[in-house]
């Protein structure tokens, strides 16, 4: 375990089981559809790479970079999109692939932006859900959820603090003294 991690929540084996479960469900739900997975950079990259291999259907992938954190541990409430899709999505069933559903503002904004472009459908898949942190007024519900996590700062498997810890093969709780200095 990394010296800055207080506790491990999900080991590699746990994450693999979560991804396999989600992949099977998406495969069942999207049979015969024109699937486009949209990865929200950067935190979702590990999850997306594993999830797309667990989906037993043809699918396209693309990437968006959107965030509401900046370099902080608390959302500032403003969602900025710095990288957009390369596809005309009007003929696709979209699944937005997110690392963590926290305040909900990022996913809500992306859902609104993509829905306005006229795809066949837009769904949301998040590896982690942190319901205690949901922002007031966010009504978006996840279509696919990997697991719930406590109201703590989590890192690993793509999730970071200040661009560190993304490469950890597990998800753990970061020690508060690391980010409170």
What is each stretch, according to the model?
Residues 1-181:
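PRPP-associated nucleotide enzymes
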């Amino acid at each position: 375990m990394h010296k800055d991690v207080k506790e491990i929540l999900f080991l590699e084996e746990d994450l693999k089981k979560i991804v396999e479960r989600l992949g099977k469900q998406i495969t069942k739900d999207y049979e015969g559809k024109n699937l486009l997975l949209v990865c929200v950079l950067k935190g979702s990259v590990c999850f997306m790479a594993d999830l797309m291999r667990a989906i037993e259907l043809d699918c396209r992938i693309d990437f968006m970079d959107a965030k509401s954190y900046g370099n902080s541990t608390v959302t500032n409430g403003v969602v900025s999109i710095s990288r957009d899709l390369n596809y005309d999505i009007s003929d696709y069933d979209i699944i937005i692939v997110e690392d963590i559903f926290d305040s909900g503002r990022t996913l809500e904004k992306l859902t609104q932006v993509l829905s306005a472009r006229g795809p066949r459908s837009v769904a949301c898949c998040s590896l982690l859900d942190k319901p205690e942190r949901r922002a007031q007024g966010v009504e978006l519900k996840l279509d696919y959820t990997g697991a719930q996590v406590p109201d703590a700062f989590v890192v690993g498997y793509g999730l970071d603090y200040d661009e560190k810890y993304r490469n950890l093969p597990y998800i753990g709780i970061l020690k508060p003294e690391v980010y409170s200095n």
